[in-house]
Amino acid sequence: MNRSEKAAIIEQLKARAEGASIAVVTDFKGMSVEELTRLRVKLRENGAEYHVVKNTLARIAFTDGAHDVIKDVFKENCAVALGFADPVAVAKAVTDFAKTSKIFTVRHGSLEGKFLSGEQVSDLAKLPSKPELIARALGTMNAVPTNFVSLFANIIRGLLYALKGIEEKKAAA
């Protein structure tokens, strides 16, 4: 690989990393092409990409960027998953794949510029996804007016039953 090819790889990876909300560094040593392809498909379904790049090029690409906190973890056989949509979905995809593979491990990550250990990436994967959190928040906000309307309707219904009882009592007398 000549110098211009290396520079192109660095620029491409740097540009992709700048647009990513999460970057997860993994160890892929000993994985087959079939396993890597399955991982890439799973990540693509969750709005992410998986890049196997030389460590030196990755260190240069991640210097002075949104995810520069992970530039020093590129050692031995590393690859990086870059997530552009929901960071939780990417963390889940990588963590789930690590559970099914004996070789694949999650090393570190970066979420919006904050360093994450492999354990923290696994913890992030346990959280509900962004759409689930939005649905829960909307459900909670919707519950307050619904409960208020139900309470108000019960008060009015009780008043009507009381008035109906008084009316029946007067009609019987």
From Swiss-Prot:
PROSITE patterns: RIBOSOMAL_L10. GO terms for molecular function: large ribosomal subunit rRNA binding; structural constituent of ribosome. GO terms for cellular component: large ribosomal subunit. Keywords: Ribonucleoprotein, Ribosomal protein, RNA-binding, rRNA-binding. SUPFAM superfamilies: Ribosomal protein L10-like (SSF160369). The keyword Ribonucleoprotein applies. CDD domains: Ribosomal_L10. One of its GO terms (biological process) is translation. InterPro entries: Ribosomal_uL10, Ribosomal_uL10-like_sf, Ribosomal_uL10_bac, Ribosomal_uL10_bac_type, Ribosomal_uL10_CS_bac. Belongs to the universal ribosomal protein uL10 family. Part of the ribosomal stalk of the 50S ribosomal subunit. The N-terminus interacts with L11 and the large rRNA to form the base of the stalk. The C-terminus forms an elongated spine to which L12 dimers bind in a sequential fashion forming a multimeric L10(L12)X complex. Forms part of the ribosomal stalk, playing a central role in the interaction of the ribosome with GTP-bound translation factors. This is Large ribosomal subunit protein uL10. It comes from Nitratidesulfovibrio vulgaris (strain DSM 19637 / Miyazaki F) (Desulfovibrio vulgaris). The lineage of its organism: Bacteria, Pseudomonadati, Thermodesulfobacteriota, Desulfovibrionia, Desulfovibrionales.
